[in-house]
């Protein structure tokens, strides 16, 4: 039976806070009772049976384990679920009962170190490169035991579409990228070309052009594997590292995720590394092409991409650049004396990989970069200690649920905890849930980054991180503006609570450090980027080499990050009015202008990290209201309310499809279904913007939907994915279904039900 381990170290692991926040799964053949084994198998069968209609796992294995460990059984004395008829009004008693049941359930799945473990997955390109990398390096059986392989195979088959292909993400239509990577991974894991649905998957691949039609990232991976040729890839020249730092194309100006992908990719490209050509690789060369491998025109293949994958087509100027580098640049750089430049560039590239590894404790910024850095370190020295340290951190990325074993983007431990604290505090029930808040407070304090990156971090194109919070945990090390702001808010709110209830508050200097990070990130237009100050020209996006992402080349400002920063600074200003007051006032004023300028004519804001207009509008409204705006003095807020009211469904909820993010047009979920997370965002926005002062009826109706949707155990149902990134890929946050209904109910009780009668 699989067990989730919390806060545990092990051989080859390094931590700066004793592994607080670490979560990883291990298989224990002796764990569990026969009844638990039977229940787990039932949950797996249910998911597989419904996999085409319900594509997101509900994180049921983790929830089952933690409820047992926290001694919450089926006989716990919780009130019965409230169900209100259309004719009934919401009463304080009904609302408090629902809140109590919701927080009781959510407290029962809190880890002992204070965070709430949860899935953060959904893309169908995180897992397969790891399988390929471990196969290339010969470490597959060392890292993946029989149970790992069994659950990975389960996951990939569970998320195969009815047409035989696999999507870019689990809710998406079939793509060559997802299909080819998944097919290859299954073959590596021992599935035969005719096993189960493999033949159907291969048919989809061949019917859509074969492996030559895989996008650029896929071409890179199957080349490194040996099932494709470097001559069929557009160049990834490491020589960009040799450009002067002021050059617009210098990697130091890239978005950190782009830079950290390019570092190891350029190293492997410059080495023209290819893994061992085994019998399996030779078989893949026959299985996945529509013509003999030795007759493929690799130059033509460079820019061949299946139409199903083509979200961001290359502009002509980009193809001209790749053509020049391919036909001219590579010839020069592989001949003496120009080859000396390549050797120098490779040295710089791998040194940057070293720096990222060491400063992230071999976690790296995310799963895509992790696998690339791992294989780069193996190519550099297969017997190195660094490679062993990389292997030791792989389990940090595993997540297991009823649909199988998957790889997370990384983890959302801190992000979820900061929201959860605010949600519980909004309900005014802190006395009853003091132990929950105390543990969460401990986690927040232990997760703040206490130091900047090592050495001359500016020379390594890193920004300050002392005082920040990461998306996940301290060991990760990467500062994020909105995570820092939400962490600051949570810590400030808890500092106002009695220490005997929630524990001692953070030292004042640590609040100051957090504010320093936030202020350092604001752009000249008033907006806030996510990780680092904006430092590149927007036209560089013309050279985005991926065909399936948008806005991936440079750091940019986000409505969500700006809204969070405004809230954090506004709350800090109330508690510490003398600290950098003029700077904070100017910062907030500029941020307000940015938010107002980014509003769409229909009153909405586009959200880049959640789906989509509902999400962006929530952050914008929260930012404006935290800084003194309301429906009486802000046209932006009145327009926001009008927008949200126009999208309320006949069932009183809101439900927005991921297609909104892709197409940049608000799109309802199929069948006009309501999504409880998005409904909660809309209700929070309307509540804080002051809609209840105009007409509270839409809020009452939406709140009744939340109350009636609660499950018997106090949980809320898992519905459609609500996270997104780079406009075209979804990400599931399984804790959102608990956090945001709790938060919306708490604010409704305080600001609507107790202030505005029916």
From Swiss-Prot:
It is an enzyme of class 5 (isomerase). Its EC number is 5.4.99.41. InterPro entries: SQ_cyclase_C, SQ_cyclase_N, Squalene_cyclase, Terpene_synthase_CS, Terpenoid_cyclase/PrenylTrfase. GO terms for molecular function: lupeol synthase activity. It catalyses: (S)-2,3-epoxysqualene = lupeol. The active site is at residue 482. Expressed in root nodules. Induction: Down-regulated by methyl jasmonate (MeJA). No effect of gibberellin A3 (GA3). Keywords: Isomerase, Repeat. One of its GO terms (biological process) is pentacyclic triterpenoid biosynthetic process. PFTB repeats lie at residues 149-190, 511-552, 588-628, 637-678. GO terms for cellular component: lipid droplet. It holds the Pfam family SQHop_cyclase_N. Belongs to the terpene cyclase/mutase family. Oxidosqualene cyclase involved in the biosynthesis of lupeol. Required for the production of betulinic acid. This is Lupeol synthase. It comes from Glycyrrhiza glabra (Licorice). The lineage of its organism: Eukaryota, Viridiplantae, Streptophyta, Embryophyta, Tracheophyta.
């Amino acid at each position: 039976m699989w067990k989730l381990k919390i806060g545990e170290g092990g051989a080859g692991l390094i931590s700066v806070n004793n592994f607080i926040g670490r979560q990883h799964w291990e298989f224990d053949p002796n764990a569990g009772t026969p009844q638990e084994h039977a229940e787990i198998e039932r949950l797996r069968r249910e998911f597989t049976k419904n996999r085409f209609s319900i594509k997101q796992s509900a994180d049921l294995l983790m929830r089952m384990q933690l409820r047992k460990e926290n001694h919450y059984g089926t006989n716990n004395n919780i009130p019965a679920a409230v169900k209100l008829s259309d004719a009934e009004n919401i009463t304080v008693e009904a609302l408090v009962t629902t809140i109590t049941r919701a927080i009781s359930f959510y407290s029962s799945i809190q880890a002992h170190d204070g965070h709430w473990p949860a899935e953060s997955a959904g893309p169908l390109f995180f897992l397969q490169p790891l399988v390929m990398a471990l196969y290339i390096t010969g470490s597959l059986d060392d890292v993946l035991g029989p149970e790992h392989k069994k659950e990975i195979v389960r996951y990939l088959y569970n998320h195969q579409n009815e047409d035989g292909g696999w999507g870019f993400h689990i809710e998406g239509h079939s793509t060559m990228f997802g299909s080819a990577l998944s097919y290859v991974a299954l073959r590596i894991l021992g599935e035969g070309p005719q096993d189960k649905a493999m033949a159907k998957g291969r048919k989809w691949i061949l019917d859509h052009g074969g492996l030559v039609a895989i996008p650029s990232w896929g071409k890179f991976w199957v080349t490194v594997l040996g099932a494709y040729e470097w001559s069929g890839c557009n160049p990834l020249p490491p020589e960009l590292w040799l450009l002067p730092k002021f050059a617009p194309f210098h990697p130091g100006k890239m978005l950190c995720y782009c830079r950290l992908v390019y570092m190891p990719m350029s190293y492997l490209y410059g080495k023209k590394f290819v893994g061992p050509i085994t019998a399996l690789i030779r078989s893949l060369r026959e299985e996945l092409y529509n013509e003999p491998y030795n007759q493929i025109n690799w130059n033509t293949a460079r820019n061949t991409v299946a139409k199903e994958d083509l979200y961001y087509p290359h502009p002509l100027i980009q193809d001209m650049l790749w053509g020049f580098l391919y036909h001219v640049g590579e010839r020069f750089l592989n001949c003496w004396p120009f080859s000396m430049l390549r050797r120098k560039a490779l040295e710089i590239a791998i040194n940057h990989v070293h720096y990222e590894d060491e400063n992230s404790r071999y976690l790296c910024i995310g799963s895509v970069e992790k696998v690339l850095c791992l294989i780069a370190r193996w190519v550099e020295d297969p017997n190195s200690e660094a490679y062993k340290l990389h292997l030791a951190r792989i389990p940090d990325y595993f997540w297991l649920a009823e649909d199988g074993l998957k790889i997370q983007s990384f983890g959302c431990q801190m992000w979820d905890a900061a929201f959860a604290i605010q949600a519980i505090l909004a309900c005014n029930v802190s006395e009853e849930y003091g132990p929950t808040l105390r543990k969460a407070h401990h986690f927040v304090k232990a997760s703040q980054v206490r130091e900047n990156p090592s050495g001359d971090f500016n020379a390594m194109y890193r920004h300050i991180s002392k005082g920040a919070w990461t998306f996940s945990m301290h060991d990760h090390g990467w500062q994020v503006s909105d995570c820092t702001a939400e962490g600051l808010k949570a810590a400030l709110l808890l500092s106002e609570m009695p220490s005997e209830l929630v524990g001692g508050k953070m030292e004042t200097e640590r609040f100051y450090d957090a504010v320093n990070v936030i202020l350092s990130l604001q752009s000249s237009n008033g907006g806030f980027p996510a990780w680092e100050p904006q430092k590149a020209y927007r036209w560089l996006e013309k050279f985005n080499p991926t065909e399936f992402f948008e806005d991936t080349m440079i750091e940019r400002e986000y409505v969500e990050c700006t809204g969070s920063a405004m809230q954090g600074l506004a709350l800090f200003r109330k508690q510490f009015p003398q600290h950098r007051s003029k700077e904070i006032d100017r910062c907030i004023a500029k941020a307000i202008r940015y938010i107002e300028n980014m509003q769409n004519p229909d009153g909405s804001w586009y959200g880049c990290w959640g789906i989509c207009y509902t999400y962006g509008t929530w952050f914008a409204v929260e930012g404006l209201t935290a800084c003194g705006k309301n429906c009486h003095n802000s046209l932006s807020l009145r327009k926001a309310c009008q927008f949200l009211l126009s999208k309320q469904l006949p069932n009183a909820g809101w439900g927005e499809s991921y297609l909104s993010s892709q197409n940049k047009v608000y799109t309802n979920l199929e069948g006009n279904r309501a999504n409880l997370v998005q409904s909660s965002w809309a209700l929070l926005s309307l509540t804080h913007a002051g809609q209840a002062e105009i007409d509270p009826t839409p809020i009452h109706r939406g709140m009744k939907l939340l109350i009636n949707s609660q499950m018997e155990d106090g949980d809320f149902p898992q519905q459609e994915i609500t996270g997104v990134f780079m406009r075209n890929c979804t990400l599931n946050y399984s804790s959102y279904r608990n956090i945001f209904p709790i938060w919306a109910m708490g604010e409704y009780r305080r600001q609507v039900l107790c202030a505005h009668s029916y």
